[in-house]
Amino acid sequence: MSWPTFWYQTPKQSWKTALLWPVGKLVCWVAARRLKRFKKKGPSKITAAQVVVIGNIVVGGSGKTPFIQWLGRQLSEHGLTFGVVSRGYGGQSKVWPQWVTEHSEPTMVGDEPVLLAQSLHCPVAVSPNRADAIALLESKYDLDVIISDDGLQHYKMARDIEIVMMDSERLLGNEYCLPAGPLRESKRRLGLVDFVVWNGGDASDLASETSTIMKLVPQHFRSVANPKMILPISSFKHEKTNAMAGIGNPQRFFNTLSELGIDADVTPFADHKAFQSSDFDTFESTKPLLMTEKDAVKCRAFAQPNWWYLEVQPLCPATFAHQLFHKLGHYDFTI
């Protein structure tokens, strides 16, 4: 999805901001009232597991999925059991809640839940009401931690820890609430969560006692049709390629390819787009097509042999992991 350019301009640069500002103020006020009501008398917790919400206050991609992958692997490495709940955004199923496996159809349950099931090999449940998804997890598993993919503003779900993801390139935009700007709620919300994680950026500028930096380190390319096939990261340096991305911030992916020395003709698609084979008819079939792992999940059924996705490794500082595990009540975490 392409976001309005005036969201990322100063108010003086766009008359649209001034026109929509009163509506944005109302959205901020309603969001603040909902939060106040939740803090005063929120829903009772239905699980003994620690519920960790990974959300954002800015619309669009911010790196929630790779951070959840990082967190899940940290939990596994330290012997903690976990599951993931999600709304299943973009899923067309009429039956909720439901389980998600690595073989689930993204068009039915959403692309991100399928990707998390494939990459983390953990139980995943989806429902527009995340409390129902948690109950489904609890019906079968005794978990230490439940991770909520998004859901910061989903106040039907009780939680123990709130983590907000932020894009270090787009920041808060013009700092106005929808529709005048990109914020779901006031920037003051950042001061009320447990941690803020910046996707990329300079640690000296963004890191603090309650915030940290996540780096996405390119590892290699995997075949979309056969993920067991791997190519070195340098494979496409001297080759003309196509690249596509249907994520919240496709330019970030295209910039990464450029930094790797890859010359690509790029095509952005809407976030969460349900791809069909006809969407790729305009791409030159003789050129390799590069994409993100999230896109690959939705293209595997009709992928061509020269389609590849970039696998990245999300990394956060060990000091942050120590803080987070301490917050979870696991004081024996060792760096």
UniProtKB/Swiss-Prot annotation:
Any one cellular-component term (Gene Ontology): plasma membrane
Assigned keywords, A-Z: ATP-binding, Kinase, Lipid A biosynthesis, Lipid biosynthesis, Lipid metabolism, Nucleotide-binding, Transferase
Residues at which ATP binds: 58-65
EC number: 2.7.1.130
TM stretches of this protein: none
Protein's pathway: Glycolipid biosynthesis; lipid IV(A) biosynthesis; lipid IV(A) from (3R)-3-hydroxytetradecanoyl-[acyl-carrier-protein] and UDP-N-acetyl-alpha-D-glucosamine: step 6/6
Highest rank taxon of the organism: Bacteria
Enzyme class: transferase
Keyword Kinase: yes
BP GO annotations: lipid A biosynthetic process; lipopolysaccharide core region biosynthetic process
GO molecular-function term, one example from the UniProt record: ATP binding
Keyword Hydrolase tagged: no
Family according to the record: Belongs to the LpxK family.
Function field: Transfers the gamma-phosphate of ATP to the 4'-position of a tetraacyldisaccharide 1-phosphate intermediate (termed DS-1-P) to form tetraacyldisaccharide 1,4'-bis-phosphate (lipid IVA).
Classification via HAMAP family: LpxK (MF_00409)
Protein name: Tetraacyldisaccharide 4'-kinase
Gene name of the encoded protein: lpxK
